[in-house]
């Protein structure tokens, strides 16, 4: 089952059968971002919340240890993290954990070998998903795809710049339409999307549409 699921997911991404449906800040969503979650999925725990409005005061509904729970929000600076085209040959090493660890306008960005402080990418449109600014938090976008969906020019849809991790949802070969959430923070041991190239375009409705070709590597493990 794991091999079939992974092959089908890879085929969908390769032939362009995914269509991003990206949205801005949802009703009831609080400002700020979610703290990094680098821990493994040790237990299968039900979600304690679904959205920010279910959390008290300034807490946000974020994934921690692979299930959603109310946690203190973190301050997130404006601008998107630059793309990292490098391949890491050394062990993962985090030099920062959140934007406030970085000086000035620098952001704590996830690079090939871990998080470090970097200047935000130039020319990014404010409010576009993937930037994880104070209005969008760390959830970058919502996407869905089906076997007949294509962007207008027939090429695959692409994710905003950066490394995006699919939340804990297992893709089944029988699924004709599978919605998924992605995060800029690693959520192990689920799907990991790498090598995404994108040019974000803002529509009149404030959405970000990314009809560009991307190359993607996938790693997955089945939930226990």
Swiss-Prot record:
Keywords: Disulfide bond, Protease inhibitor, Repeat, Secreted, Serine protease inhibitor, Signal. It is found in: Secreted. Induction: By p53/TP53. Residues 1-24 form the signal peptide. GO terms for biological process: antibacterial humoral response; innate immune response. One of its GO terms (cellular component) is extracellular space. Residues 27-73, 74-121 form the WAP domain. The keyword Signal applies. It comes from the Eukaryota. InterPro entries: Elafin-like_sf, WAP_dom, WAP_four-disulfide_core. GO terms for molecular function: serine-type endopeptidase inhibitor activity. Disulfide bonds join 34-62, 41-66, 49-61, 55-70, 81-109, 88-113, 96-108, 102-117. Pfam families: WAP. Gene3D superfamilies: Elafin-like. Its main location: secreted. The keyword Disulfide bond applies. PANTHER family: WAP FOUR-DISULFIDE CORE DOMAIN PROTEIN 5, WHEY ACDIC PROTEIN WAP. Putative acid-stable proteinase inhibitor. This is WAP four-disulfide core domain protein 5.
């Amino acid at each position: 089952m794991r091999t079939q699921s992974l092959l089908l997911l890879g085929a969908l991404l390769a032939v362009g059968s995914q269509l991003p449906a990206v949205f801005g800040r949802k009703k009831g969503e609080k400002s700020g971002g979610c703290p990094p979650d680098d821990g493994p999925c040790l237990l299968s725990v039900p979600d304690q919340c679904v959205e920010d409005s279910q959390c008290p005061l300034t807490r946000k509904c974020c994934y921690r240890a692979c299930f959603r729970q109310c946690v203190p929000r973190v301050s997130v600076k404006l601008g998107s993290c630059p793309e990292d085209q490098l391949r890491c040959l050394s062990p993962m090493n985090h030099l920062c954990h959140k934007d406030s660890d970085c000086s000035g306008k620098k952001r704590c960005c996830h690079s090939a070998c871990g998080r470090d402080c970097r200047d935000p990418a130039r020319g990014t449109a404010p409010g576009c998903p993937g930037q994880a600014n104070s209005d969008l938090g760390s959830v970058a976008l919502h996407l869905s795809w089906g076997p007949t969906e294509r962007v207008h020019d027939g090429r695959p849809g692409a994710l905003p710049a950066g490394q995006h991790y699919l939340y804990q949802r297992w893709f089944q070969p029988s699924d004709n339409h599978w919605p998924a959430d992605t995060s800029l923070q690693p959520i192990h041991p689920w799907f990991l999307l790498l090598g995404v190239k994108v040019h974000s375009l803002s529509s009149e409705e404030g959405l970000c549409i990314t009809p560009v070709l991307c190359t993607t590597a996938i790693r997955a493990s089945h939930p226990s």
